[in-house]
Swiss-Prot record:
InterPro entries: Dihydropteroate_synth-like_sf, IspG_bac, IspG_bac-typ, NO2/SO3_Rdtase_4Fe4S_sf. The lineage of its organism: Bacteria, Pseudomonadati, Pseudomonadota, Alphaproteobacteria, Hyphomicrobiales. Gene3D superfamilies: Dihydropteroate synthase-like (3.20.20.20), Sulfite Reductase Hemoprotein, domain 1 (3.30.413.10). Keywords: 4Fe-4S, Iron, Iron-sulfur, Isoprene biosynthesis, Metal-binding, Oxidoreductase. Converts 2C-methyl-D-erythritol 2,4-cyclodiphosphate (ME-2,4cPP) into 1-hydroxy-2-methyl-2-(E)-butenyl 4-diphosphate. Pathway: Isoprenoid biosynthesis; isopentenyl diphosphate biosynthesis via DXP pathway; isopentenyl diphosphate from 1-deoxy-D-xylulose 5-phosphate: step 5/6. It comes from Brucella anthropi (strain ATCC 49188 / DSM 6882 / CCUG 24695 / JCM 21032 / LMG 3331 / NBRC 15819 / NCTC 12168 / Alc 37) (Ochrobactrum anthropi). This is 4-hydroxy-3-methylbut-2-en-1-yl diphosphate synthase (flavodoxin). Its cofactor is [4Fe-4S] cluster. It comes from the Bacteria.
Length: 423
């Protein structure tokens, strides 16, 4: 599976040059586009539930999916999950999330070690005191044996306390001590880099190592990843841990990662959202895609532009139509992506009145300007910048939906036929 299958825009700033890492065929870093990944919240030992959620995340556009491997039952389930997913046509790479006993689980379950595409190691809890380096080395040696990459994932909530204490003591002895926050940031960065250096000394290539350093505050995340980017060329996994629920989590993650991505920092992202009760786990994938697409780094799905509404648009018709078109696009994208290559570049405008409606509609591939309050009950439609018709009557929404479907068929279906004919 290749992440190159989705369109990639040129980056407005030079991308930080990192070493590319292949994760089950998906390239993270190097010149590859920023990869979207996610994580399940099922009990991995529950094969049916985990397969269903991984499949849903993959269909939504997650290019890598992480699963918890926390005990023998979970490790034993991994090859079954991998096999079931492949039978269903989901070749998405699976990452094993290990804490505390990862070295033991990988040794005791070789089929699990083989089935996973990457191992996540947390330096803060891989082992303690004299066992730490040995157990870290055990996992790295497993990665070498099975030719797997690792993510060395530092998290401020489980930071190596010995390292933090050492840096705090040194700072206390210094003439111009840093703040506790600055020492914490330095400890996070050092934990990642020391662990990466140790992995390389053991024999793991730099093209097998991805680093992450997750914190829960936006300014800390920006500072920590900026430091990491300056001190190494390892591929970087961005994520704001414990971002929270709903709007708060989306805004915090987007603010932090948007700034880093704009500076060319970051090779793969996960937006960690706390699901609302009964919420859809795939929401985090959608938000990740929308962040990258809004910033112009990648294209995943056609853009539907719609005005926010004002006193001129007291009717909800344009809002309902915009939502219907967006939902229809999302529902059909898994099929359209295969059937109509390039369709993710489509732009659609659904506008609510005469002020900006015609202009915005002309700039879209296909757009409609619905009548505002007091305007003539008609809706001009523009295709490729030219007015092609005016819709009237109670079926304006249905008529425009059909025009969008016909446009996709005629434009992107024709492109595919021409390409097939040339071959």
């Amino acid at each position: 599976m290749s992440s190159e299958a989705v369109s990639y825009f040129s980056h407005p700033f030079p991308r930080r040059q990192s070493v590319g890492v292949s994760v089950g065929g998906v390239i993270v870093g190097g010149s590859a586009p920023v990869v979207v990944q996610s994580m399940t919240n099922t009990d991995t030992a529950d094969v049916d539930s985990t397969v269903a959620q991984v499949a849903a995340l993959h269909r939504a556009g997650s290019e890598i999916v992480r699963i918890t491997v926390d005990r023998d039952e979970s490790a034993a389930a991994v090859p079954k999950i991998r096999e079931r997913l492949e039978r269903l046509g989901h070749d998405v790479p699976l990452v094993g999330d290990f804490h505390y006993i990862g070295h033991k689980l990988l040794a005791d379950h070789p089929a699990c070690a083989e089935a996973l595409a990457k191992y996540r190691i947390n330096p803060g809890n891989v082992g303690f005191k004299d066992k730490k380096d040995k157990q870290f080395a055990d996992i790295v040696e497993m990665a070498i044996r099975y030719d797997k990459p690792v993510r060395i994932g530092v998290n401020w909530g489980s930071l190596d306390q010995e390292l933090l204490t050492t840096l705090m003591d040194r700072n206390q002895d210094a003439g111009a001590p840093l703040s506790a926050q600055e020492v914490m940031r330095e400890a996070i960065v050092q934990s990642a880099l020391i662990s990466a250096n140790l992995a390389e000394e053991i024999g793991l290539g730099r093209d097998k190592i991805i680093l992450s350093a997750k914190v829960s505050q936006v300014q800390d995340l920006i500072a920590v990843y900026t430091m990491l980017a300056q001190r190494s060329n390892h591929a970087l996994h961005l994520g704001l841990t414990e971002a929270g629920m709903g709007t708060k989590g989306i805004v915090a993650s987007s603010a932090a990662m948007g700034i880093l991505l704009q500076q060319g920092i970051g090779d793969t992202i996960r937006i960690s959202l706390t699901p609302e009760p009964g919420g859809d786990r795939t929401r985090e994938v959608q938000v990740s895609q929308e962040l990258l697409q809004t910033m112009g780094f990648r294209q995943f799905i056609p853009i539907v532009a719609a005005c926010p509404g004002c006193g001129r648009t007291t009717s909800t018709v344009f809002q309902e139509l915009a939502q219907t078109i967006q939902d229809d696009i999302r529902r059909n994208m898994p099929v359209w992506r295969e059937k109509y290559p390039g369709v993710e570049a489509l732009s659609v405008a659904v506008m609510g009145c005469i002020v900006n409606g015609p202009g915005e509609s002309k700039h879209a591939d296909i757009g409609i300007s619905l009548p505002g309050t007091g305007e003539t009950p008609s809706a001009p439609v523009f295709v490729d910048g030219k007015k092609v018709t005016t819709l009237r009557g109670p079926a304006i929404a249905e008529d425009f939906q059909k025009m969008v479907a016909d446009y996709i068929e005629n434009r992107f279906g024709l492109d595919q036929k021409i390409a097939a004919g040339q071959n």
